[in-house]
A protein has these predicted regions:
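Flavin-dependent oxidoreductase catalytic core characteristic
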Residues: 1-225, 229-232, 236, 241-243, ...
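Conserved protein kinase catalytic domain
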Residues: 239, 260-263, 276
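Residue-level "edge-of-site" marker
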Residues: 224, 255, 292
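N-terminal glycine-rich flavin-associated loop
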Residues: 250-270, 296
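Glycine-rich, Trp-frequent "lid" loop and neighboring beta-strands that shape
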Residues: 169, 227-228, 247, 270-324
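Glycine- and other small-residue-rich loops at beta-strand/loop junctions that grip anionic moieties
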Residues: 196, 200, 264, 291
Length: 324
């Protein structure tokens, strides 16, 4: 296992030390952001709805910041898991290094929430001294040597043969699932996907039916409702493998995942009994009907309305397309 990686002389030991230190700094910055947003949206210790509406950019930014910091935490745990197993190769070291370099820079300089929205720490009420305290020696080391052109170029060289890094699964079953779906894609999807695209064809129903038999649509649905009950990680692994072959196939299972979770968490017992087994089996294929003219996927701005009329609903509005 190489000790020095890419252009800068950072040993494996130094990389882990810097990442652990930087994660602590990120946690402190997150605490300052949480305190800042609380000051913007709270009155007398409680969230004020009017203030929350007014400061939704800051509140939204706090969610992003929390996610970024948790991402750093999980990346470090991934690297440590591989190191303990003796599988922390040059590629995985570079991936960890690039991830920390990029996220630490964004946490200090701005998170791109969209093309026209960049969140700065000050937008969440974070004082300048908290940002200055965040920029420790280890944070600056990773910011300046992490996600650099030489690091990215070396990653590109290492993944050219199809090895995209060890995912570090802590469950052997996930590796088996990954292999199973990679074989399925190599046999049933990859050889045909480009022609489907060129001919603007729907994914053949035979492929969808085989995916249903493999359990794609019920991965996270509990066994009680006819699913596999395997959890979010399995769903991510399967989606990644299907998407590797063809993005259209990769998106099929995610709609079922979203619909099943919404019904499981908020549905009545009758709705669960009716829909969950059928979603898990692939008998029902949910779709996401979001996009509207002049709206995109801004769910807060949707104009379509459903009004109860006896035992049914009257739906009025315009949709541009749906996503399956």
């Amino acid at each position: 296992m190489p000790e020095a990686i890419a252009d800068a002389h950072i040993t494996t030991s130094d990389l882990f030390t810097a990442c652990r230190s930087a994660l602590g700094s990120a946690d402190s910055l997150l605490a300052a952001a949480r305190q800042g947003v609380a000051g913007l949206v709270s009155r007398d210790g409680k969230v004020d709805n009017a203030a929350f509406e007014r400061e939704q950019f800051a509140a939204h930014g706090l969610s992003w910041t929390t996610t970024y910091v948790e991402g750093l935490r999980q990346m470090l745990a991934w690297g440590e898991r591989l190191q303990d197993a003796g599988n922390f190769r040059e590629l995985e070291q570079l991936i960890l290094r690039a991830a920390y370099g990029e996220y630490l820079n964004q946490l200090a300089g701005g998170l791109s929430l969209s093309q026209g929205e960049v969140l700065r720490p000050a937008d969440m009420g974070v004082p300048a001294e908290a940002v200055a305290a965040f920029l420790t020696e280890d944070v600056r080391l990773l910011q300046t040597t992490g996600n650099t052109p030489p690091v990215r170029a070396r990653i590109a060289e290492l993944i050219a043969d199809g090895d995209f890094g060890n995912p570090g699964f802590d469950d052997d079953m996930l590796g088996m699932v990954q292999d199973q779906f990679r074989r399925f894609c190599e046999d049933k999807v990859t050889p045909f996907a480009h022609d489907w695209h060129l001919r603007d064809e729907l994914i053949p129903i035979e492929v969808v039916e085989e995916m249903a038999e493999l359990g794609v649509f019920g991965l996270t649905v509990s066994e009680e409702w006819g699913g596999l009950g395997m959890g979010k990680m399995a769903m991510c692994v399967v989606t990644e493998e299907l998407s590797r072959a063809y993005i259209g196939v990769g998106s099929l299972g995610t709609r079922s995942e979203i619909a099943a979770e919404l019904i499981r968490l908020g549905g009545t017992d009758g709705q669960k009994e009716h829909y969950l087994p059928k979603i898990a089996s692939g008998e029902i294929l949910p779709t996401a009907v979001f996009t509207e003219p002049n709206t995109g996927s801004d769910l807060g701005a949707l104009r379509t309305r459903a009004v109860r009329d006896g035992d049914s609903y009257k739906v009025t509005g315009n949709k541009t397309w749906i996503t399956h």
